[in-house]
Amino acid sequence: MADFDMVLKCWGPVEADYTTHGSLVLTRLFTEHPETLKLFPKFAGIAHGDLAGDAGVSAHGATVLNKLGDLLKARGAHAALLKPLSSSHATKHKIPIINFKLIAEVIGKVMEEKAGLDAAGQTALRNVMAVIIADMEADYKELGFTE
């Protein structure tokens, strides 16, 4: 619980502008981990330099952060929220678990820069994301999805 609360203390600026922060997160993910872009076929035709200004990238980034906000606010009681996300990402989108670890690190960097998440907050976010990702991985296994 303490980790969730620590992250939520810095969530306000992110929540106030999911679109901008979401664009920053996805653009940075695609820059630092170019292999992740292939997991988003709808962005395939967008030049790398145009990703940051693309409305579709911003909208998807906003969706990611909005869902993460819901998971954070559940403070660990997130099974009902997480199951449908796990299901769609395993069966429809076929997203390997490692990619959630990559985006979690990027979210931490963006929150440090834009929302004041300090070193203790970074550790708290890593702990929170480790729990969420482990639960997703368990859901993936139930669904028979292995990378």
UniProtKB/Swiss-Prot annotation:
Coiled coil region boundaries: none
Pfam families named among the record's database cross-references: Globin
A GO molecular-function descriptor: nitrite reductase activity
One GO term describing the cellular component: extracellular exosome
Globin domain sequence ranges: 2-141
GO biological process: removal of superoxide radicals
Domain of life: Eukaryota
Record function comment: Monomeric heme protein which primary function is to store oxygen and facilitate its diffusion within muscle tissues. Reversibly binds oxygen through a pentacoordinated heme iron and enables its timely and efficient release as needed during periods of heightened demand. Depending on the oxidative conditions of tissues and cells, and in addition to its ability to bind oxygen, it also has a nitrite reductase activity whereby it regulates the production of bioactive nitric oxide.
Quaternary context: Monomeric.
Name of the protein in its database record: Myoglobin
Lineage: Eukaryota, Metazoa, Chordata, Craniata, Vertebrata
Gene: mb
